[in-house]
């Protein structure tokens, strides 16, 4: 990420891209796993929901500028597109390396409603998840059932 302030942050300096999308079966359902920059790749979350994920775990450390501009809208979009809960723990505060992270750990329901927003202060938060909401939302808006491979793009003359 290149910020207008001249700051440059590269997850790729510490992490490499995975070769597979990962889900894990848990007591609350199938959990799709992703981190930080992954949030920007809608196709990953389509794959996770196609694999049966009913909740998505997305821990992250967004900078304050990118967080203010993108964090809430992307988290809500991924919840809506996947018709799944999003559980997103977020680093917050001022850091020794000069970073200032946005915070705002979130829990978002499958309809895109924010159930918990922790703001910029550190802390522990709790949200009650209605596990029936996933099935209800998927019945109301069957986007996963209607998802299909995108055909090749044609360039109009």
Which residues fall in each region the model found?
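Glycine-rich, small/acidic residue-mixed loop/short-helix segments
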Residues: 127, 132
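Active-site catalytic loop in hydrolytic enzyme cores
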Residues: 1-51, 64-73, 140-143
């Amino acid at each position: 990420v290149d910020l207008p302030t001249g700051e440059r942050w590269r997850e790729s300096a510490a992490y490499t891209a995975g070769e597979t999308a990962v889900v894990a079966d848990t007591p609350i359902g199938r959990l799709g796993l992703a981190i930080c920059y992954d949030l920007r790749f809608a196709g990953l979350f389509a794959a996770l929901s196609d694999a049966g994920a009913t909740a998505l775990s997305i821990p992250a450390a967004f900078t304050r500028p990118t967080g203010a501009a993108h964090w809430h809208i992307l988290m809500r979009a991924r919840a809506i597109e996947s018709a799944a809960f999003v559980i997103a723990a977020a680093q917050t505060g001022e850091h020794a390396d000069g970073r200032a992270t946005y915070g705002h750990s979130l829990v978002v329901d499958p309809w895109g409603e924010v159930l918990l927003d922790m703001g910029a202060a550190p802390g522990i938060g709790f949200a009650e998840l209605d596990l029936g909401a996933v099935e209800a939302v998927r019945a109301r808006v069957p986007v996963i059932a209607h998802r299909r491979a995108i055909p090749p793009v044609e360039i109009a003359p």
